[in-house]
Amino acid sequence: MVYIVFMLLVLLPVLAGWGRIFSHLFGAIFSGISFYLLAGIFTVATLFTLLSFFLPLNIYVEGGTLAVGLLSFFYFKMYRDFRLFLARNALYFIPLSLVTILFGSYFPFILDHFGYYVPTIKWLSEVGMVRGISNLDLLLGQMSVWHIFQAGFSNFSDPFLRINVLMLLVYVVYIFEKHSWLHFIFLPFLFFFCQSPSPDLPVIVISLMLTNEFLHFNKKITLLFIFSVFVFVIKPTMVWLPLFALLYGVVILKVRLKVIIPGILLLLLFFMKNVWTFGFPIFPLELFDLGFSGQPNAELLRNSAEMAIMKTYDMQYAFSEIERFSKLDYLKNWLFLSGIKGKIHFAFLLGLITFLLFCVKRKSRILWLLFISILFKSILVLLFSAQYRFFLDVFLVIVLVIFYETVSKKIPLITFSCLSVLGLLFLSFPGQLKDLIPSFKLGSFMTGFNTNQFYKPSHFELKKYETHQIGNLKFNVVQDYPFSFDTPLPAISPAFIQEDVDAGIFPQLKGNSLKDGFIWRKISAEEKEKLKIILKDLPR
C-alpha cells in the first residue's frame, strides 16, 4: 500500500498539471480537479502513443513527463485546488481512498494480466511500439492505449502496474465534485479491476462520467466527442460511446459535423497504431486490408476468430457444433449457457428490455439515442464475440440512466459500504467465493490476503525460462507456466509456439534489431521438429 500511495502522490499532481495545460489550450468539459486529471490522462496517453512509434517509453521519457507535469502543477498553483477539495471532502474521501488502495494491493487474478497486459507493457517500455509484433504473439498486436499510458510510468512511478487505482480515485473525485452519489454503487464492482492495468476499468469509469455529462445536457460537444473516441481507442467494444456522442451532437445540440474533426484525428492515430502492430486498422478483424506488410498469417487469424466464437459460448461447444447452429440456436444457447455466464447473459437481455421500456415511458430523445447506441454495440458484439465481459459497461450505464435522478446520497453510501466489505472478504478468503460460485473460474486465481500488501502490492515472480533460436530469431520460452509475464524479451508463450507449429510458420526479425519488427515465414521439417522438442513437457 505504501508503494501505491507513493505512486498517487507523484502522478496525481503530474497528471493534473498536464490536464491544466490541456484546459488552458482547449477548454474543459466540466470544472474541477477531476477534469484536469482526466485531461491529463488523455494528453499523456496520446503523447506516449505518438512517442512509442519512435522510441521506448523508458525512464527518460517518464522523467521528462513528470518534470513537465510538476512544473505546470506549481506554475498554475494547482495545490490550492487540491487543498480546497480536501478541506471540503476529507472526512469521506480519505477513508474511501484507503479502501481503494487496499483493494489495489491484492494479487492480480485476471489471466490477461500475465498473458497480455504485462508483456505488452514490457515491450513498450523496453523497445517501444514494434511493427508487426502480432507475428511474434498475436495478442500483442492489440497494444491498448491504456497499456501505452501505463508503460510510460512503469519505470519509476508505478513499477507494480497499479495505474487503475489512480483512475478509480479520479472517478471518486468526480463523484464528490459533482455530488453524483449514485456512482458510489459502482465502485465495489470496479474494485475487482484495480489489481491489474485492465483497460476495462478506465473505459467503464470514463464512459460513466461522460454519460453523466450527457444526461445533464453538457454542450461541450467537441471535447465530449474526442474523449468518447479516446474511450473507444482504449477498448473498441465501447463503440457505443462515440456513436452516442455523435448522435447527441447532431440530434440534440444540432451542431455541424466539423466539431468531430479532432475526434476523427485521434481515431486515425488509433488506426495507424493498429496497422503498425497488427497490419489491419481494427484488432483482431481482417477488415479494410490496405496491403500493409507485417500482417499475421491467415491461418492464425482464422484460429483466433474461431476461438473468439467459442469463447462466446464459454468453450462449452466446439466450433464445428456452433457452425451448425440455427439463428435461434445461436441466441438460445448463448442465453442458457450453464454456469454463471449464462445467468449474466440472461440478465443482460433483461437489462436491455428494461431500458427499452424505460425509454418508452420517459419519451426522451436523449434516452432513445443512448438506447440505439447501446443496441448497436450489442449487435456488433453478438456477431463477433459475445463474451460477458464485453457487456459489463452496459449494465452500469443502464443503472445510471434509470436511477440518476431519483436516488439520494444515503442509499448509495450504504450499498457501497456493504458491497465493499463483501468484496474484501471475497479477495481475502477466495475459497468461499469458489464454493459459492463454482463456475466463476477467476476465483481459482485469487490468492487471498498477505501482510506484505501493507508495504507493496502483491505480485508474482517466476523468472524461469530457456533460450532457443529458429532462423534469425533468438527467443525465450517460459518454463513451468503458460504465460511469459516476466520472461526477458523477445518471449513467446508455449501456446503461441504451438499455433505456429500447427500453421507451419515461425516469426523472424525483419531487420537487425527488435525495433525493426517481425515477419513470419514457412519453417522447414527440421525446424518444426526442433520446435516440437521445445514444446515437449511445457504447459499450454
What does each model-found stretch correspond to?
Residues 1-82, 219:
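Membrane-embedded, hydrophobic transmembrane alpha-helices
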Residues 17-24, 164-177, 326-364:
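Hydrophobic, aromatic-rich transmembrane alpha-helices
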Residues 48-52, 188-192, 221-247, 262-268, ...:
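Membrane-interface alpha helices of multi-pass inner-membrane proteins
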Residues 76, 80, 241-264:
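Perimembrane helix-loop-helix junctions
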Residues 102-176, 194-196:
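Active-site lumenal/periplasmic loops and adjacent helix-entry segments of GT-C-fold
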Residues 105-108, 258-334:
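Membrane-lumen/periplasm interface segments of specific transmembrane helices
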Residues 122, 200, 206, 234, ...:
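Hydrophobic/aromatic-rich transmembrane helices and adjacent perimembrane loops
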Residues 296-313, 421-540:
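Intrinsically disordered, polar/acidic, low-complexity terminal segments
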